[in-house]
């Protein structure tokens, strides 16, 4: 059954009602400063719509991975401050999740006001494997909303987690799908069910083990898989090439060889780099040179060299493939983009995605490090067809997995 939506809730009327909304506010911090507020901005439309409609809004979110207890390093205080700036209204911050302060502030909320609960992961029950423990916390969360309350799930970046604030609370209140989740699912459905051809997938990041299931699934759906990032070296090694001191997952070699055989037998074409930027070590100022992919240990640093980016020839070839696509999905940087000397491969891929989008294709940046990379490198969000707020959730959807935070909202909401 299709999920009821935020619009359904707004049409039913929310004035005077308390609405819990699970948002994705898991943003990077430098001390007390939010360094990338993309997820906060993406969460604001639903929060603003509820507040302007007269709801008493209680926002739930996590930040980082605290160990199930309060930790000042993971407090949502900087997030509340930035949210208030962007919202142009006060955002109160509770000192706890469902404790005395949260209950008192929730009870004192007036129509149109916004309260942010402290990091939900400060309560160990949020991520518990024990269903009863999570349900107990969800019951306390639901109690903050009262008898006429409602729940909106709008944290796409967390929907692959079976956590109390994402999954269990939806069973204890009338539950509605937020616009961010709806928009993400619409795009991902296009990628999995009806992608326009040619369909090119760009995969990077450090570990091939993180991408095994998505490669397995996309080999039968995409036309071309472009492989970069640290994961490429396991592919090169599987082909018999030496990779020096580059990142290598030897326990995945047999799996990768099987993928290469499937590709050769008619599945999606796997395209590997033909040249690599090899460095003397993992450092921004490391000496580096461009070497052919089949001669990575032939340079000045021999077998001690490590690959930190795809080479210029590969960057041009990947960009050409991307520009010629009607559908592009990208997850994972091509190199260590945080170091300027090793950012050019990622920059070339990002630029090509913007060009594919400008030409009328669908370009999707799959969240996580890829989203951080495009912003770090100065690209505007609206230059891409879609930037996902959930890297892990996007991948699990493309793997064909069920997302608990989505299925929890699929029951019929009631106003």
Swiss-Prot record:
Catalytic activity: (2R)-3-phosphoglycerate + ATP = (2R)-3-phospho-glyceroyl phosphate + ADP
Domain of life the protein comes from: Bacteria
One GO location term (cellular component): cytosol
Record-listed substrate binding positions: 24-26, 39, 62-65, 121, 161
Binding sites annotated in the UniProt record for ATP: 211, 307, 338, 367-370
Keyword Cell cycle included in the entry's annotation: no
One Pfam short name: PGK
SUPFAM superfamilies xref list: Phosphoglycerate kinase (SSF53748)
Membrane-crossing segments per the record: none
Cellular compartment(s): Cytoplasm
Enzyme Commission code: 2.7.2.3
Pathway: Carbohydrate degradation; glycolysis; pyruvate from D-glyceraldehyde 3-phosphate: step 2/5
Any one GO biological process: glycolytic process
Keyword S-adenosyl-L-methionine: no
Main location: cytoplasm
Keyword annotations from UniProtKB, A to Z: ATP-binding, Cytoplasm, Glycolysis, Kinase, Nucleotide-binding, Transferase
InterPro entries: Phosphoglycerate_kinase (IPR001576), Phosphoglycerate_kinase_CS (IPR015911), Phosphoglycerate_kinase_N (IPR015824), Phosphoglycerate_kinase_sf (IPR036043)
Broad class of enzyme this protein falls into: transferase
GO molecular function: ADP binding; ATP binding; phosphoglycerate kinase activity
Complex formation: Monomer.
Family recorded in the similarity comment: Belongs to the phosphoglycerate kinase family.
Protein name: Phosphoglycerate kinase
Lineage of the species this protein comes from: Bacteria, Bacillati, Actinomycetota, Actinomycetes, Micrococcales
Gene name of the record: pgk
